[in-house]
Amino acid sequence: MRHRRRTPHLNKPADQRKALMRALTTALLREGRITTTKARAKAIRATTEKMITLAKEGSLAARRQALAYIYDKELVRSLFEQAPERYRDRPGGYTRILRTVHRRGDGAEMAVIELV
């Protein structure tokens, strides 16, 4: 039974799902705004917020945790430099999800997820 399990499966095996989440999180932190499906946007919100919280903490252990998840080493460096000052007064809620039009090919619900 999967009662109280929070991670959406996104119709993928665990290894593919983890790689997708890492790639989407990396892209969001690099670009600041990406367009994806609504389900994927909701799924990466938690990991993105966790990475920004780690950057605000700024310790060596937090940096190593971020390096283990985010693909780009330079992105981690810039995140740890910019996030503490950018999100100093914000205790959470670093992302915003905006719904957009359905995808033409299959009618999937699309959304734009962006950093606040």
Curated annotation (Swiss-Prot):
Keyword terms, alphabetized: Ribonucleoprotein, Ribosomal protein
GO molecular function, one term: structural constituent of ribosome
Cellular component, GO, one term: cytosolic large ribosomal subunit
Keyword Repeat: no
GO BP: translation
Pfam families given in the database record: Ribosomal_L17
Subunit (UniProt): Part of the 50S ribosomal subunit. Contacts protein L32.
Family of this protein: Belongs to the bacterial ribosomal protein bL17 family.
Record-given protein name: Large ribosomal subunit protein bL17
Gene, per the UniProt record: rplQ
